[in-house]
């Protein structure tokens, strides 16, 4: 009898310990990344297994020569307008993940995004580390703040796509997204284009993009980048010459979501 009591107690301790480890792993910070192979090969996505039970988007089908242009826009400047001009001239629809700053400072630019058929998406209200958000109410507030401001300013509803700032998330983040019916969006290509004081040269940027693009590429660019604004037309023309087409997030979701 004493043996069974000890065994039961031990099992309870193990159960508590296991639940604690599980809880910790659910909130552990995860940083999204990919391993580029160059030569237009699809990259290695080490974290794809973590996303298998979610509807997260990060790459399209391997057998389709389609790319998806996505932009993280925290604020507005003349480069954002130039990028919109280029997309319009090619009749390409992109996805813009926005913060409150660009709505407050460049409302007409944000409205133009929607008017011209681009998908305007959620990049949170504070651009904080979403892996640290462990309460679903706080998480919802992060999404609602920018979405409500967008609605009030433009009259449009924000699309139900969400990109965590700097790609920081946790398993809990994915659970919150599923509960709130929001689709997380990551990427299979990005490069160091965000710092306007240290912009890469147009030649190096084009080489980086054109050597890394691949079937199903979800490309992350920052539209405030002068380099991106200067090279986007050339990049699109070259990709078209190579036989690539350009898809939307809704199209990608329809192909890969469970």
Task: Locate predicted features.
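N-terminal pre-catalytic segment of deacetylase/amide-hydrolase enzymes
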Residues: 2-10, 14-70, 76-85, 89, ...
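Enrichment for repetitive, rod-forming helical segments
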Residues: 4, 9-12, 130, 170, ...
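Metal-dependent polysaccharide deacetylase catalytic core of the NodB/CE4 family, i.e.
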Residues: 65-67, 77-79, 84, 88-220, ...
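Histidine/acidic-residue-rich catalytic or RNA/ligand-binding cores of hydrolases
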Residues: 196-200, 230-234, 258
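Catalytic grooves of carbohydrate-active enzymes
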Residues: 214-250
């Amino acid at each position: 009898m004493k043996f069974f009591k000890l065994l039961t107690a031990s099992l309870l301790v193990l159960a508590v310990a296991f639940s604690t480890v599980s809880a910790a792993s659910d909130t552990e910070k995860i940083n999204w990344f990919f391993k580029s192979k160059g030569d237009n090969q699809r990259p290695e996505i080490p974290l794809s297994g973590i996303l298998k039970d979610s509807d997260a988007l990060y790459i399209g089908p391997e057998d389709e020569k389609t790319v998806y242009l996505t932009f993280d826009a925290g604020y507005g400047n003349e480069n954002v307008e130039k990028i919109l001009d280029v997309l319009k001239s090619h009749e390409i629809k992109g996805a813009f993940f926005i913060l409150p700053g660009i709505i407050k400072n460049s409302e007409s630019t944000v409205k133009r995004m929607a008017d011209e058929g681009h998908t305007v998406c959620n990049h949170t209200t504070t651009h904080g580390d979403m892996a640290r958000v462990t309460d679903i109410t706080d998480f919802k507030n992060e999404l609602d703040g920018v979405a409500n401001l967008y609605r009030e300013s433009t009259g449009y509803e924000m699309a139900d796509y969400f990109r965590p700032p700097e790609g920081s998330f946790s398993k809990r983040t994915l659970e919150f997204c599923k509960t709130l019916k929001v689709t997380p969006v990551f990427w299979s290509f990005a490069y160091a284009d965000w710092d306007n004081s240290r912009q890469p040269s147009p030649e190096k940027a084009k080489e980086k993009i054109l050597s890394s693009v691949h079937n199903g590429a979800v490309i992350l660019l920052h539209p405030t980048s002068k380099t991106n604004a200067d090279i986007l037309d050339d990049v699109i023309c070259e990709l078209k010459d190579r036989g690539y087409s350009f898809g939307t997030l809704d199209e990608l979701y329809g192909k890969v979501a469970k």
